[in-house]
């Protein structure tokens, strides 16, 4: 653990914000496959290898709760390293919230979202399957935003209606750009106190907002009265997304289109400094989907997903979840490998969005933030809880030179000790 963090916290440059985000992906990566490093299912993370510390052999066995499997206890233990405190409560705080409380005990600046929680997922029988930010007392740190338009409104587009205390809300203006036109003109005009580089950056930020408004709300420039209300999400939500645990049919294109918009909007919120803490989920713990579609990576076809056909089953038995139940070190595990590889591609999609902009210290938001990637288990067979909760995959970013990236480390330690090392390096403790 001593090798994870640089010895002197003073190595971190102080002129960028402290940020902490948790990135969760469902079902996990079996520990034996993690040993293959970037030559296996972790390949999509390879272009970012210099900015990541991959941690193998992280032990989350203390999170075991009798009578339930890792889809519940391991999922709630991700980023908390504690057994679940109930069906809708963690056994302690998540690491992002420990860091938030340490650096902002009185709250963040007005106008900022204290904690942003979003994701693309379908299983929802317990909150811990999909929500991964918890307060110091283990309660959820915010409301999950599972639709792109809801996440956009959470960050940019809703204000309280009056001061009469009722719960009604109204939209500030459907277009964020309409609400900042005067400021934009001033800060990019002749009397602006900004330099040319800063003016350019302001313009680029607003152009990026316009791009996401168009995508999230189907805005049409010809509509003089503003954009249309956003359409319903093209994927299922609520009870329809988890019909009795039987799973849903979905194409790879439908899944990734929804996720990319969600990931883009979340990254935009961070880039605009509206959000510094929170979590994002790509597929819930124990996710049940029947995925169909050609999967390509780096210009080559990796696999053709067709879960129900390849499993020769329908309902829950025809879902990709079953490949984790069927995992064996003695088999090729072709289908599981393809699914896990795809999940790493989509995690990398989000990370790359945060690696595009440089901050004042010359590093990207990705490099300056503490972004922790994890999942619920290191084995999906459910017949050995110790094996199931051992070897849980973790990766972290450098957090502004606080952690040593560019390595794959066999940690061989409890998740609780790993997390305490991390938050300690961030100037926090719990």
Region annotations inferred by a language model:
Residues 1-430:
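Ligand-binding pockets and gating/stacking loops
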């Amino acid at each position: 653990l001593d090798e994870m963090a640089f010895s002197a916290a003073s190595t971190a440059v102080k002129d960028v914000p402290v940020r902490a985000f948790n990135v969760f992906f469902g079902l996990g990566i079996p520990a034996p496959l993690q040993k293959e490093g970037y030559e296996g299912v972790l390949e999509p993370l390879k272009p970012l290898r210099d900015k990541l510390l991959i941690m193998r052999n992280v032990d989350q066995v203390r999170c075991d709760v009798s009578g339930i499997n890792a889809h519940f206890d391991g999922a709630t233990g991700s980023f908390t390293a504690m057994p679940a405190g109930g069906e809708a409560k963690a056994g302690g705080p998540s690491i992002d919230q420990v860091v938030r409380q340490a650096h902002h005990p009185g709250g963040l600046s007005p106008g900022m979202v204290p904690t942003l929680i979003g994701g693309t997922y379908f299983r929802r029988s317990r909150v811990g399957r999909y929500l991964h930010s918890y307060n110091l007392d283990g309660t959820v740190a915010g409301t999950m935003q599972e639709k792109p338009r809801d996440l956009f409104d959470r960050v940019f587009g809703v204000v309280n209606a009056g001061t009469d205390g009722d719960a009604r809300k109204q939209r500030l203006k459907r277009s964020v750009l309409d609400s900042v036109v005067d400021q934009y003109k001033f800060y990019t005009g002749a009397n602006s106190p900004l330099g040319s580089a800063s003016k350019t950056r302001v313009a680029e930020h607003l152009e990026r907002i316009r791009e996401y408004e168009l995508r999230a709300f189907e805005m049409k420039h010809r509509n003089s009265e503003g954009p249309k209300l956003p359409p319903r999400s093209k994927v299922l939500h609520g009870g329809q997304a988890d019909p009795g645990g039987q799973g849903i049919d979905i194409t790879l294109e439908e899944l990734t289109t929804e996720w990319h918009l969600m990931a883009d909007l979340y990254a935009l919120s961070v880039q605009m400094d509206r959000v510094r803490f929170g979590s994002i989920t790509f597929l819930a713990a124990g996710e049940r989907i029947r995925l169909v579609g050609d999967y390509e990576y780096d210009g080559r076809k990796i696999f053709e997903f067709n879960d129900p056909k390849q499993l020769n089953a329908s309902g829950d038995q025809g879902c990709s979840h079953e490949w984790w139940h069927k995992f064996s070190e003695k088999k090729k595990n072709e289908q599981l490998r393809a699914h896990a590889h795809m999940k790493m591609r989509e995690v990398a999609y989000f990370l790359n969005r945060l690696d595009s902009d440089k901050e004042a210290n010359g590093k990207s938001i990705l490099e300056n933030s503490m972004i922790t990637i994890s999942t619920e288990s290191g084995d999906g067979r459910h017949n050995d809880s110790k094996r199931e909760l051992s070897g849980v995959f973790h990766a972290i970013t450098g957090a502004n030179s606080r952690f040593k990236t560019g390595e794959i480390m066999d940690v061989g330690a409890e998740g609780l000790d790993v997390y305490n090392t991390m938050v300690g390096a961030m100037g926090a403790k719990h």
